[in-house]
Curated annotation (Swiss-Prot):
It catalyses: Exonucleolytic cleavage in the 3'- to 5'-direction to yield nucleoside 5'-phosphates. Keywords: DNA damage, DNA repair, Hydrolase, Magnesium, Metal-binding, Nucleus, Zinc, Zinc-finger. PROSITE patterns: AP_NUCLEASE_F1_3, AP_NUCLEASE_F1_4, ZF_GRF. It comes from Saccharomyces cerevisiae (strain ATCC 204508 / S288c). This is DNA-(apurinic or apyrimidinic site) endonuclease 2. CDD domains: Ape2-like_AP-endo (cd09088). The gene is APN2. GO terms for cellular component: nucleus. Belongs to the DNA repair enzymes AP/ExoA family. GO terms for molecular function: 3'-5' exonuclease activity; DNA binding; DNA-(apurinic or apyrimidinic site) endonuclease activity; double-stranded DNA 3'-5' DNA exonuclease activity; endonuclease activity; phosphoric diester hydrolase activity; zinc ion binding.
Amino acid sequence: MSSSENTLLDGKSENTIRFLTFNVNGIRTFFHYQPFSQMNQSLRSVFDFFRADIITFQELKTEKLSISKWGRVDGFYSFISIPQTRKGYSGVGCWIRIPEKNHPLYHALQVVKAEEGITGYLTIKNGKHSAISYRNDVNQGIGGYDSLDPDLDEKSALELDSEGRCVMVELACGIVIISVYCPANSNSSEEGEMFRLRFLKVLLRRVRNLDKIGKKIVLMGDVNVCRDLIDSADTLEQFSIPITDPMGGTKLEAQYRDKAIQFIINPDTPHRRIFNQILADSLLPDASKRGILIDTTRLIQTRNRLKMYTVWNMLKNLRPSNYGSRIDFILVSLKLERCIKAADILPDILGSDHCPVYSDLDILDDRIEPGTTQVPIPKFEARYKYNLRNHNVLEMFAKKDTNKESNKQKYCVSKVMNTKKNSNIKNKSLDSFFQKVNGEKDDRIKESSEIPQQAKKRISTPKLNFKDVFGKPPLCRHGEESMLKTSKTSANPGRKFWICKRSRGDSNNTESSCGFFQWV
């Protein structure tokens, strides 16, 4: 992390609420990267590092047996939604800091209500053997369920909410946080596109409904929509629009106004127009008049800032050249525009193909006074939703299953070896057993008559030199050795070729790939 980003994160006062969104692409895997690798898989350490008060992670890719680790974070309320059937997929978490009682934000950050999904049709426990939908329980549901979609029946609504894509939390200060991971239709199927558009429409209809009943909205997460032309490196290149240092986004959009508008209203990408219709700062005049949300990052950084990307294609190694798009947002109601004090992306934070985005809001006069009555913790809080209060029962069962499998493996290995010293290794771990066989050449192997003598000899395999097989790598236009790749196309499957080893970037960027290509 750069020193400039450290300064940004440190510049937060006690009176501001820091919102942070991060598509972690697997909550376990991002702990493999600095600085998180030194945090012992502690979410509390991660949240303190960011100095964040309200955090949402997308693509948790976790399951019920692992939620005990992420659903009980000291000093935070935890709200987690995971897919109902598909394991290791999607998943959204929202964590709310619990300040000390003498902290200025203590009353403002009190959680009033919380719910899972966007339609209100999902249910929450209502006693030992019963459950009730959020929309039918005024004590749990946040509201705004009317006219979400005229064709949306209960079955369709439950399908929309079955993939663990949204968590909503209402605070005592009147803010409703909507943590979301919108579908992307990565397979480009007709069914996937219909699901994507319906989810987006229902979500934004719910936002409007909540706004009408007086709620202040913070919509944060991976929306999977690139809102403007200046937010898409790929489209800028397709339109042959050069990005030079003196040219800012404002000048670019003025010079290529038609292309900037076409990018939004393109009939092949209806999700962009749908998304822009909720934005008060949209380039579309009609949309901006009806828009009710402000893009905090764009407001603070202005439209003049280019290359403000939040996601990159990692398979093509496009992050080093900053060739990506912006699909992660923190959007707030117009009512909160005056509260926005800071907002930015953190592109130097690794651990995912996305980077974190944060916004600082000072709620000023909207702050709740100390006399406010504290309400019960919502039933959707992870400790209640997933039964994490009673000695971590889920984790106990997980350990039990693991031990059974381990014992089964030990039995099978011992039976196959069938040696005279089985009794001596019965209580040893599987790892130490294999280590001894491979590293110390256990005497039991010598005693076996079934192993031929020639098997004991080391077999030396001649090592082939890379250049002996493919020849010396040709030089690219940068004068550097090129990189060997394998074709995966149907026309030339498995055929080798050389390309420039630098990552793809803007066509006028001399530091990016020169476009060199040569078949082997």
